[in-house]
Amino acid sequence: MKSKISEYTEKEFLEFVKDIYTNNKKKFPTEESHIQAVLEFKKLTEHPSGSDLLYYPNENREDSPAGVVKEVKEWRASKGLPGFKAG
């Protein structure tokens, strides 16, 4: 796994979020591996809401993987944090 969000393209990160959202058993065959992916999401995004972005979306956001990625992208930009790599 990549260690920084800036190592992901937006498309790659969206796929990662989709896999978490759907609990993709090919990517995360065990509950523990799924939990580790959620923890990795929290670490990568650095967002104060952490995994709540996945499970408890705010009312102003689309409840989907794309909505999660959009919120992360906008929040990181507003804080001057690096975004996704070009690609």
UniProtKB/Swiss-Prot annotation:
Keywords carried by this UniProt record: Bacteriocin immunity
InterPro entries xref list: Colicin_E_sf, Colicin_pyocin
A Pfam family this chain is assigned to: Colicin_Pyocin
Keyword Acetylation: no
GO molecular function ontology, one term from the record: toxic substance binding
SUPFAM superfamilies, sorted: Colicin E immunity proteins (SSF47345)
GO process annotations (BP): bacteriocin immunity
Membrane-spanning ranges: none
Classification via Gene3D superfamilies: Colicin E immunity protein
Family: Belongs to the colicins ColE2/ColE8/ColE9 and pyocins S1/S2 family.
Protein name: Pyocin-S2 immunity protein
Naturally occurring in which organism (per UniProt): Pseudomonas aeruginosa (strain ATCC 15692 / DSM 22644 / CIP 104116 / JCM 14847 / LMG 12228 / 1C / PRS 101 / PAO1)
